[in-house]
């Protein structure tokens, strides 16, 4: 465990009695606490990496956490460890359960650029502002479902 940690951070890392919310401001060491806790659970507590999930909001944060954990656990297998974004976790679950829902697991998810292209193709020769308005109408319809 890193000597750079303060007492509350070390306490959070060693806490094992249930869920734990780490709430702190930017730059306060939340990512360090989470990555150190993952290493602690695997190395010191013998937890299987496949029983650990760290979910974050951005791809950048997920990549940083993956790199930090890899550095902390160098030489230790992390097979099955999940460190990803909420969106990536959602897609993973949907792909795993796609057949049960009657879909193929190799489905595509459209981003805003893909949607713009489809609306543009369907609308024909209209200006960009009209295409954006059509996208908003479609979005409102979807939200009303």
Set out the residue ranges of the language-model regions.
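Post-Walker A alpha-helix
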Residues: 34-35
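Conserved lysine of the Walker
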Residues: 30-31
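A basic/glycine-biased coupling hinge at the interface between accessory DNA-binding modules
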Residues: 17-18, 39-145
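Conserved pre-motif I regulatory segment
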Residues: 1-26
């Amino acid at each position: 465990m890193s000597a750079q940690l303060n007492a509350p951070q070390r306490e959070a890392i060693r806490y094992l009695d249930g869920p734990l919310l780490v709430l702190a401001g930017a730059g306060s060491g939340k990512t360090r606490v989470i990555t150190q806790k993952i290493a602690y659970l695997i190395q010191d507590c013998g937890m299987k990496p496949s029983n650990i999930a760290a979910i974050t909001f951005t791809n950048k944060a997920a990549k940083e956490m993956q790199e930090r954990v890899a550095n902390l656990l160098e030489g230790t297998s992390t097979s099955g460890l999940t460190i990803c974004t909420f969106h990536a976790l959602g897609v993973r679950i949907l792909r795993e359960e796609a057949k049960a829902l009657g879909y193929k697991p190799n489905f595509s998810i459209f981003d805003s650029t893909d949607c713009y292209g489809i609306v543009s193709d369907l609308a024909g020769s209209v200006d960009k502002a009209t295409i954006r308005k059509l996208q908003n109408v479609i979005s409102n319809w979807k939200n009303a479902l």
